[in-house]
Amino acid sequence: MFKYIKKAEELGASFADIRYERVIANEVTITEDRKYVSHGVDEGYSIRVIYNRNWGFKATDKITENEIEDTINHIYGDERVNIVYLPSKHDTIKIGKDINKNEEEKINDLHKVASQVNTLHPSIKSYSIKYYDEIFHKEYYSSEDREIIADGSSSSLSILVVAREGDVTVEVSEILSTQMGYIFDVFDINQVLANLQKRIINQLKGSTPKAGEYPVILAPEVVGIFTHEAIGHLSEADVTLNGSLYKLRNKRIGDEFLNISDLPAMDHPQSSLVYYDDEGVEGREVKIIENGILKEFMTDRYYSAYLGQPPTGNARAQSYRNFSLIRMRNTYMKPGDASLNELFEGIKEGYYLVSPIGGETSSNGTFQFAIQEGYRVENSEIKEPLRNIGISGNTISTLNAIEMISKDFGMSSGFCEKNGQTVQVSNGGPHIKVKKLKVGGYV
C-alpha cells in the first residue's frame, strides 16, 4: 500500500492514508411468522488525501495509481484543513474472541429463543428476534509510515416483543452486543428473557405516572443512555462547537464526585473495543467531566488540531465507503461511594427508572427519554410498576441536580446512528439520585 501513498505524495499531497476493509456479515431474523437468513461479504478501500489544504476522499473496490490521481483531482473544501500528525508506527492486533459457530447452530439457538419468547405471556401478539455477527479484517496505512492491521469479530442479539390486553398495548425490547465471542456463550439468555417477561407484566398492569418534577433514581441502563445521548453527543467536537458545552470548557458543571469518560475499551463483555480508530490513532481515555469540571472533548485528527487537544482516537467509519466521523466508544459515568439504599433515603414521593427504550438530545442541551421499566417510590420504598413513562430535562441542570452516586456499575451496548452511519457503541454507569427531574407520560 505504501507505493500508493508515495504516489499521492509525488502528486503533491501533504498527507495521505488508505484503509482496506473486508467484512463477512451474517444475519438471522425470526418473527412470529417468518425466518430470514442473509450473508454478505463487503470489501474495499478508502483513499484520503490532503492537497492544497483541501480534503480528497474516494471509496473503491480496487486500488490503482489512477484511483490516487482521481482522488486528488476531486478535492473539496476551503483550503483550511489542518490535522494532527503522528509518529511512525507498525502494529498488528487481535480484537476480542472468535465466533466458533456454524449457521445451523445459530439458527437452532434463535429458534430456542423464539419458542421461549412465545411462552413469556399469553398476551404477546408479535415478536422479532435478530441475530447479527461479522468477522472483519482492517488495514490502515498513512504517509507518516503508520501501518495498523486488525482482525476481530462481533455478535449481537436484539429482541422486540409487542403484547396487548384490551386497549393496552406495550412494547419491550432488549439489545446485547459483544466482541468477546458468540453472544449465546457470553450472556445468560434465560436472564434476558426473564427481564423481558417482567417488563411485559409490569407494563400491562402498570399505571401512568403523575406528571411533574420529582426526585428520581436512575439505574445504570438509564444513566448509560443519559451519558451517551445528553453528554456524549454534545462532547463530540464536531457537535460541540455549535452546541451548549463549548463555552463551558474548564468550568464546573457538576459536583466534584461527578466523572464521565469515554474509553477505547473496558473490561466488560458488552464493551466496544476500539484500540485504534479509522484514522490510525491510538485510543485513549477522554475525561469529558473530571471532578465536576468539563475538561475535554472527543476528537478526530482535524478537531484535535483545531482545539489544540491531543488526539483521542474517536474517528470511526461505518465502512470503507464512509469518511470517518467523531463517534463514541464506551461512554460512562464513574461509580461513587454510596450504597443503593442510601440513594432511596429521604424520598417521600418519586420514581425509580430502570430501563430505557429510546432517547434523543438536541445541541442546546435538552433531552427526552422513554422508559420501559420504572416504579413509583413512596417513603423510600419501591412501589407499583409504571408504564408509558417519559423523562425530559436540560443536560447541565440535570448534572447539577445529581445528589448521590452509587458504587455499583452496569453497562449496555448497542448501535448508534450519526449522519447516516451506524457503529457499535457501549455506555453505562452506576445508580444516581437526581434531586429533581421532569417526569411525564408518552404515547
From Swiss-Prot:
EC number: 3.4.-.-
Variation of activity with pH: Optimum pH is 7.0.
Needed cofactors: Zn(2+)
GO molecular function, one term: zinc ion binding
Family annotation (Gene3D superfamilies): PmbA/TldD superfamily
Keywords annotated in UniProt: Hydrolase, Metalloprotease, Protease
Annotated GO biological process: proteolysis
Effect the entry attributes to changing E229D: Abolishes metalloprotease activity. Does not affect homodimerization
InterPro entries per record: Metalloprtase-TldD/E_C, Metalloprtase-TldD/E_cen_dom, Metalloprtase-TldD/E_N, Peptidase_U62_metallo, TldD, TldD/PmbA_N, TldD/PmbA_sf, Zinc_metalloprotease_TldD
Stretches of the chain forming a coiled coil according to its record: none
Effect of H233Y: Abolishes metalloprotease activity. Does not affect homodimerization
Pfam family, one: PmbA_TldD_2nd
KW Membrane (keyword) present: no
Temperature dependence: Optimum temperature is 55-65 degrees Celsius.
Motif (HEAIGH motif): 228-233
GO cellular component: cytosol
Subunit structure and binding partners: Homodimer.
Description of its domains: The HEAIGH motif probably functions as the active center of the metalloprotease.
Function, as annotated: Zinc metalloprotease. Able to degrade azocasein in vitro.
Family indicated by similarity: Belongs to the peptidase U62 family.
Official protein name in the record: Zinc metalloprotease TldD homolog
Species the sequence originates in: Saccharolobus solfataricus (strain ATCC 35092 / DSM 1617 / JCM 11322 / P2)
The encoding gene: tldD
